[in-house]
Design a protein with these regions (language model features):
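Cysteine-dependent hydrolase recognition
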Residues: 22-270
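Tryptophan (W) side chains
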Residues: 9-10, 20
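N-terminal signal peptide c-region/cleavage motif recognized by signal peptidases
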Residues: 16-18
Length: 270
């Protein structure tokens, strides 16, 4: 979320219901780690609830380690995935990948680290500097900021991927069920952006003006509210909340509608 916070967040909320760019059951591959019992259970449940065919579940045997070396990532995750797609004639069909394992979540080589979804999306990137909340040149791609909807055909091989995992299977099932309940509902509510005491995250604050422009452009009935506060407290019908705090207080006091987007805009989550 750090790369395109304002674009990804607001476009998702305001116009996602108007555009369908793949990512349906037949375009999704679920990747499970057979070395994690919970990974397999979550993967099967997600596939069943979303109507994803059993043939679209890829079983891998990945070591239980938080950080995987780049060579091992290539041989144990990326190469087997591409081989699976080629073997089953799915390379031109699959546009979305869902990892249901907890570990690994980072890829490392020569002191450089990428998140596993980042490395999977557009390949491992070497970052030669540490920009404060800025996108380094190595992280740029032609899809970022584009007005063209994402498809595997026009995205130069980029692979949309996400990690789906929680502390317990029951929690994961609850999240999956909530996402299903949100499908096509277009609920009413308010999207919040917070200007917090974390000054490093507040550099994005000026970009939120663009979100108001997008809201007016698409004539959305979604309410937006910007606050100078470290937290939301006891709000109802929360559609979205973006905060610069890694551990925002009172978060559980709020009523998030099914399908709501929440992000602490930090690297705290790995």
């Amino acid at each position: 979320m750090q790369r395109l916070l304002h674009g990804m967040w607001w476009v998702t909320i305001l116009i996602a219901h108007q555009v369908w760019a793949g990512g349906g059951p037949l375009q999704t591959l679920v990747i499970v780690n057979d070395n994690e019992t919970q990974s397999l259970a979550i993967g099967r449940y997600y596939a069943a609830q979303r109507g994803i065919p059993d043939a679209h579940i890829l079983h891998l045997n990945i070591p239980d380690t938080a950080i995987i070396r780049l060579n091992d990532y290539g041989s144990q995750i990326l190469t087997p995935t591409l081989a699976f797609l080629a073997e089953h004639d799915l390379a031109d069909q699959i546009s979305t990948f869902v990892f249901t394992f907890r570990r690994p979540y980072r890829v490392r080589t020569a002191g450089q680290e990428n998140g596993i979804t980042s490395a999977f999306y557009y390949g491992f990137k070497n970052y030669t500097s540490s920009p404060d909340c800025q996108l380094v040149p190595a992280g740029e791609n032609t899809y970022a900021g584009s007005e063209t909807a994402f498809t595997p055909d026009n995205a130069e091989g980029y692979r949309l991927s996400a990690i789906l995992t929680l502390d317990t299977l029951a929690e994961a099932q609850t999240i999956i069920d909530r996402s299903l309940a949100a499908d096509y509902t277009r609920p009413a509510g308010t999207a919040y952006a917070l200007y917090t005491s974390d000054s490093f995250r507040n550099v994005r604050w000026p970009q939120f003006d663009e979100s108001q422009f997008l809201q007016r452009l698409v004539k959305s009935d979604i309410q937006t509210e910007f606050r100078f506060s470290d937290f939301l407290f006891s709000e109802s019908n929360v559609l979205s909340c973006v905060t610069g705090l890694a551990q925002p207080p009172f978060i559980s006091s709020n009523d998030f509608v099914p399908g709501a987007i929440a992000d602490h805009v930090t690297s705290f989550g790995g």
